[in-house]
């Protein structure tokens, strides 16, 4: 009787190949199979599922916190595409994107997060995908580049993702689910409750800040405060108001669930 093959797991992120969150992602699945890291060379937060089609991409072998990794000069989606079609040359059994430094909750982040974008790219090929993100209390932490890895900071999230990933490998995704979006609250412990949630509508109160350069010409920063209060059952409510782990099942099919006759009256 032949030896069973270890599951192939591809790990990526959007904070860059040297982010401590990527090391946490590796640690969360390292005992579950053969893990390959293919991640952006530099910070790619906010690029969503964007893909590089007007410039060539390069892959560099590197060492990410003591782990062999592939650094891709592109977006998280590029890293997933090259990870599957150039590095692995086959479909993995699971793609894990994360751990993002900063929560990815609400419909705002589903369409803008590079962490989720990379996971969605994998899901588009029928590969089970997980996106994992850690809440920060200071929004400025999202823009830091910490490389000193302290596993205890991620321990609760590592255990949650390990358990979920093991079950996804064992049983596959539920019907009509392409991606599990996992968010870990900042103060999570091993016994922190876990909620299955739906997406809140918004997480940002979008604003634009105008400033002036030394020549008096205007330039702009897109900014905005966080929305911290939302309906019970949403990911924002679970993370921001209750401090619970949030797991949101996501589908690639964005078709509105309405009777099509409702649209025909506009024709």
From Swiss-Prot:
Keywords: Cytoplasm, Hydrolase, Metal-binding, Nucleotide-binding. A divalent metal cation binds at residues 14-15, 45, 100. Coiled coil: none annotated. It comes from the Archaea. The keyword Nucleus does not apply. Its cofactor is a divalent metal cation. SUPFAM superfamilies: SurE-like. Gene3D superfamilies: Survival protein SurE-like phosphatase/nucleotidase. GO terms for cellular component: cytoplasm. Its main location: cytoplasm. It catalyses: a ribonucleoside 5'-phosphate + H2O = a ribonucleoside + phosphate. The keyword Metal-binding applies. It is an enzyme of class 3 (hydrolase). Its EC number is 3.1.3.5. HAMAP family: SurE (MF_00060). Nucleotidase that shows phosphatase activity on nucleoside 5'-monophosphates. Belongs to the SurE nucleotidase family. This is 5'-nucleotidase SurE. The gene is surE.
């Amino acid at each position: 009787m032949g030896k069973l093959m270890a599951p192939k797991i591809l790990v990526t992120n959007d904070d860059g190949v040297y982010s401590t969150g990527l090391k946490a992602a590796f640690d969360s699945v390292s005992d579950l199979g053969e893990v390959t890291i293919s991640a952006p060379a530099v910070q790619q937060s906010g690029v969503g599922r964007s893909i590089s089609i007007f410039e060539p991409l390069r892959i560099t072998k590197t060492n990410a916190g003591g782990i062999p990794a592939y650094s891709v000069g592109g977006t998280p989606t590029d890293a997933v595409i090259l990870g599957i079609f150039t590095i692995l040359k086959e479909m993995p059994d699971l793609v894990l994107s994360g751990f993002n430094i900063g929560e990815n909750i609400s419909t705002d982040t589903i369409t803008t997060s590079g962490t989720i974008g990379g996971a969605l790219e994998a899901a588009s090929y029928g590969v089970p995908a997980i996106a994992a993100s850690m809440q920060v209390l200071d929004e400025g932490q999202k823009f830091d580049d910490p490389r000193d890895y302290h596993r205890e900071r991620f321990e609760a999230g590592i255990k949650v993702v390990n358990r979920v990933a093991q079950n996804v490998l064992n049983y596959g995704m539920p019907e009509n689910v392409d991606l599990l979006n996992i968010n870990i609250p900042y103060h999570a412990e091993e016994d922190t409750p876990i909620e299955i949630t739906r997406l809140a509508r918004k997480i940002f109160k979008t604003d634009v800040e105008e400033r002036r350069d030394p020549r008096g010409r205007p330039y702009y920063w897109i900014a905005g405060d966080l929305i911290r209060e939302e309906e019970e059952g949403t990911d924002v409510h679970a993370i921001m108001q209750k401090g619970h782990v949030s797991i949101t099942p996501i589908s690639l099919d964005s078709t509105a669930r309405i009777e099509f006759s409702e649209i025909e009256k506009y024709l």
